[in-house]
Amino acid sequence: MAELSTRYNLPVNVTEKSINLDLNSTARWIKEPSVGGWTVKWGNFVFHIPNTGMTLLHHLKSNFVVPEWQQTRNLFSHLFKNPKSTIIEPFLALRILLGVALKDQELQQSLIPGFRSIVHMLSEWLLLEVTSAIHISPNLLGIYLTSDMFKILMAGVKNFFNKMFTLHVVNDHGKPSSIEIKLTGQQIIITRVNMGFLVEVRRIDIEPCCGETVLLESVVFGLVAEAVLREHSQMEKGQPLNLTQYMNSKIAI
């Protein structure tokens, strides 16, 4: 009688093994100084972050600005005219972007519960902490963050970057220029400007009598240069382009 046999089996895919070995990379935030900025490694991404815009942001926050910049100060008065607002470095602004990208996946997609829990933990860690690592049980990672799930997670982050590049630079034509998301206790606004993406985090206080109140005195904000995300996104035909195509964008940043 003929019988089924497993005499010949191909070896386990080595590439898949190498991906499995690096699943913990989503729980590590590696920041190293580089010429003119920093290199950040998270997941399977390597970001090259220039120290672009920091001087300009601080200058706009001072009272000694040229008249042409007053429009920018007025538009973002809660950032530049607010003595209690705080400027954060570009790598921290990027960290917030990544946290929002994960949160976007958590809120919009039907994820299996275990995987959803991991995405939630990672997004909260990126958004609320500045530590270089978060401990997630290896067993939990092994069960719920498989190689395929890891790929889905990274692809979701890239899709969020693509969504950001569909924004128009702040303009006077009424075209969308910001992505906003409300989380527990905070509101995050990502706005496309000439130099890249302005990231602001506002604290929200919820009072029984009045509902939500945005506490602008506790705003933190930073700037991520466009080139940082450009290399990790795909430009589609018809998407808005950057500064050189925006003759009507009169903002200083």
From Swiss-Prot:
Provenance organism: Lake Victoria marburgvirus (strain Angola/2005)
Similarity remark: Belongs to the filoviridae membrane-associated protein VP24 family.
Gene Ontology biological-process entries: viral process
Alphabetically ordered keywords of this record: Host cell membrane, Host membrane, Membrane, Viral matrix protein, Virion
Protein function: May act as a minor matrix protein that plays a role in assembly of viral nucleocapsid and virion budding. Unlike Ebola VP24, mVP24 has no measurable impact of host dendritic cell function.
Compartment(s) of residence: Virion membrane; Host cell membrane; Host endomembrane system
UniProt main location, coarse: virion
One GO molecular-function entry: structural constituent of virion
Protein name: Membrane-associated protein VP24
